Regions:
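Conserved beta-hairpin
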Residues: 30, 43-69
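Short amphipathic alpha-helix that is part of the acyltransferase structural core
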Residues: 2-42
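An active-site-proximal beta-strand-loop segment
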Residues: 36-44, 52-53, 72-78
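Acyl-donor binding region in acyl/amide transferases
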Residues: 17-20, 59, 67-135
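Residue-identity detector for glutamine
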Residues: 23-24, 41, 54, 112-113, ...
Length: 135
């Protein structure tokens, strides 16, 4: 299916929104669009990327970010934070038809939501898999 979204060169913020989604929706997106094809059974926060003006059915999500507490090694590195004050981005997946900057937009809006929903979180950690040409 080719959508009008696929013809856009760069994401326009007014055309997209980010909101919390369920684990099942994340699993569908990760299975379809993430190279690892796997998702943890649990997650602390999950957000989906949606085209503005669409009905927000979970099936219409075109991307997701998944956040969990980081590994113990990360907590040791940042000693001034407790586990409850930290989250790590463990999965990020975007459908191919999402315009450029879709991933950055999703991460930014996810961070805003985390700040609102979890004011105790003071450290967010993200990783880039350089073997997959992520930066």
């Amino acid at each position: 299916m080719v959508s009008a979204v696929a013809t856009m060169d760069k994401l326009r913020k007014k055309d997209w929104t980010v909101r919390p989604i369920d684990q099942q929706t994340c699993k569908r997106i990760i299975t379809n669009y993430h190279y690892a094809k796997a998702l943890s059974q649990i997650s602390t926060e999950r957000f989906g990327l949606f085209k503005t003006g669409q009905d927000f059915w979970e099936d219409s999500a075109l991307g997701c970010s998944v956040w969990l507490p980081p590994t113990p090694g990360v907590i040791k590195r940042y000693k001034k934070y407790s586990l409850s004050e930290c989250l790590a981005l463990t999965r990020l997946a975007i459908a191919p038809e999402v315009p450029k900057n879709g991933a950055s937009f999703l991460i930014g809006k996810s961070i805003q939501q985390i700040r609102l929903r979890r004011p105790n979180v003071r450290l967010l950690v993200t990783y880039a898999d350089t073997m997959q040409d992520h930066t």
